[in-house]
């Protein structure tokens, strides 16, 4: 089996990621490619963020949910190294054709990738 087939087979289904008529090419790519990869990488993403949080907030476990939420928002919006790490752990699972599409739409897709990851981390706040 070649790399492309393997990468695509690894991706879980995301029932909420609908493909409907009239959606943009970027939104279709997000739903067909990005969301399944993020779902596949979920445990890795949460572990990565947990390590990040504990590195910056030694008392992470005792912080209020409000302070944790603020830290998550702040980290995913302003910490360029963290954002680049998240983006890298997603685009590493792209096929060459998907990577070419990504490079053509890099700015918008980076924004969407980080936004989806931020929402996923916020929804798993109690697991971190």
Where is each model-derived feature located?
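Short, flexible segments with low predicted structural confidence
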Residues: 9, 16-20, 56-57, 61-62, ...
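Short, well-structured hydrophobic secondary-structure segments
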Residues: 31-59
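Long, highly charged low-complexity segments enriched in Glu/Asp and Lys/Arg with interspersed Ser/Thr
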Residues: 105-128
């Amino acid at each position: 089996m070649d790399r492309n087939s393997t990468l695509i087979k690894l991706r879980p289904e995301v029932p909420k990621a609908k493909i409907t008529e009239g959606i943009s090419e970027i939104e279709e790519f997000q739903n067909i490619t990005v969301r399944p990869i993020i779902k596949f990488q979920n445990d890795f993403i949460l572990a990565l963020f947990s390590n990040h949080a504990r590195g910056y907030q030694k008392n992470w476990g005792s912080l209020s949910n409000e302070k944790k939420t603020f830290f998550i928002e702040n980290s995913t919006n302003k910490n360029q190294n963290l954002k680049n790490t998240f983006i890298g752990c997603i685009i590493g699972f792209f096929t060459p054709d998907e990577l070419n599409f990504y490079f053509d739409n890099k700015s918008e897709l980076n924004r969407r990738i980080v936004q989806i990851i931020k929402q996923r981390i916020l929804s798993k706040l109690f697991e971190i």
